[in-house]
């Protein structure tokens, strides 16, 4: 980052977050509260082992219809019984420039890799403000075919130009499939 820059946006390419617009909400939170702002989704307790999980506390601040919480800590891929919540990190981050120093100071974590979650946790422990925007939309995991294919369909159906034709084609494909497998 240059001298006048103090934030970096990170958008992981294997997460499709719908509908669009969560980054704009995150910018609003950062402008109002400072620090780093992350996107969170609620998952079931059984799913938490796949994610970085937030330990959060409520804020008594209104953000025009979207939920914001203060992050007290993060745990990378905990067993369900040890998860502090069911709010998980979802590939959208506005990180204060301090993240670069934190990344230099952490050691490899889960899987023998440097984990962004560990660097964020270090910043939290050192008093850096971190908040989450709880996104009420959908998240698709593009990192495997089981998530990639439905994500493309979902995204395509929402497209103003291609959505109606895709919807019609999918109805026909489903009807043909059901007839073939009946």
Positions of the model-derived regions?
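Conserved beta-loop-beta/alpha segment of the NTase-like Rossmann-fold superfamily
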Residues: 1-58, 95-97, 103-106
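Intrinsic disorder at enzyme termini
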Residues: 166-182
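Catalytic-core segments of class I nucleotidyltransferases/pyrophosphorylases
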Residues: 9, 27-31, 59-140, 145-168
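Short, mixed-charge aromatic SLiMs
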Residues: 17-22, 121-128, 145, 173-178
């Amino acid at each position: 980052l240059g001298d006048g820059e103090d934030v970096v946006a990170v958008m992981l390419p294997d997460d499709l977050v719908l509908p669009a617009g969560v980054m704009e909400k995150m910018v609003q939170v950062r402008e109002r509260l400072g620090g780093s702002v992350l996107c969170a989704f609620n998952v079931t307790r059984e799913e938490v082992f796949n994610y970085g999980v937030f330990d959060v506390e409520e804020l008594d601040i209104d953000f025009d219809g979207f939920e914001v919480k203060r992050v007290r800590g993060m745990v990378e891929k905990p067993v369900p019984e040890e998860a502090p919540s069911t709010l998980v990190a979802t590939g959208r981050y506005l990180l204060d420039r301090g993240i670069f120093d934190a990344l230099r100071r952490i050691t490899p974590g889960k899987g023998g890799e440097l984990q962004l979650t560990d660097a964020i946790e270090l910043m939290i422990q050192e008093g850096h403000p971190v908040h989450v925007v709880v996104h009420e939309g959908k998240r698709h995991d593009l990192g495997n075919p089981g998530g990639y294919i439905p994500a493309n369909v979902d995204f395509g159906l929402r497209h103003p130009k291609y959505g109606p034709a895709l919807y019609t084609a999918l109805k026909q494909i489903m009807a043909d499939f059901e007839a073939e497998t009946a």
